[in-house]
Each structure stands twice: as structure tokens, then as C-alpha cells.
């Protein structure tokens, strides 16, 4: 399966609770931190919640 590189580019100050929890679930804690995750429906749903806080690249 394909993998996605997810990088947090904006902070969570002023973000809603579910957006903060989605970032934590993805494994992101700091700005400019990147993680590689499998491309599946669960990951896509989390990204959809925080699309304005992250940048997604296909690896």
C-alpha cells in the first residue's frame, strides 16, 4: 500500500478539541514534525479533520 508523509505546519492554539486529538492520534506534537503513515480510510479521515494544519505528501 502507499504511504503518506504528514507534516504539521500550524499550531493547535485555538484549535478545537477533536482537531487536537486527531493530531495526537496521527503522532504529531510539534510544528514541522513529520510522520509516515499507511494510506487507509482511518488516516484519511484524521487528515480531513486537520487538513488546514498539515501538509500531506505521497511517499
Curated annotation (Swiss-Prot):
Signal peptide: none
PROSITE patterns the UniProt entry points to: RIBOSOMAL_L30 (PS00634)
GO molecular function: structural constituent of ribosome
BP term (GO), one: translation
SUPFAM superfamilies, sorted: Ribosomal protein L30p/L7e (SSF55129)
GO CC aspect terms: cytosolic large ribosomal subunit
KW Ribonucleoprotein (keyword) present: yes
Recorded superkingdom: Bacteria
InterPro entries hit by this protein: Ribo_uL30_ferredoxin-like_sf, Ribosomal_uL30_bac-type, Ribosomal_uL30_CS, Ribosomal_uL30_ferredoxin-like
Pfam families: Ribosomal_L30 (PF00327)
Keywords: Ribonucleoprotein, Ribosomal protein
Record-stated family: Belongs to the universal ribosomal protein uL30 family.
Complexes and interactors: Part of the 50S ribosomal subunit.
NCBIfam families: rpmD_bact
HAMAP family: Ribosomal_uL30_B
Designated name of the protein: Large ribosomal subunit protein uL30
Gene that this sequence comes from: rpmD
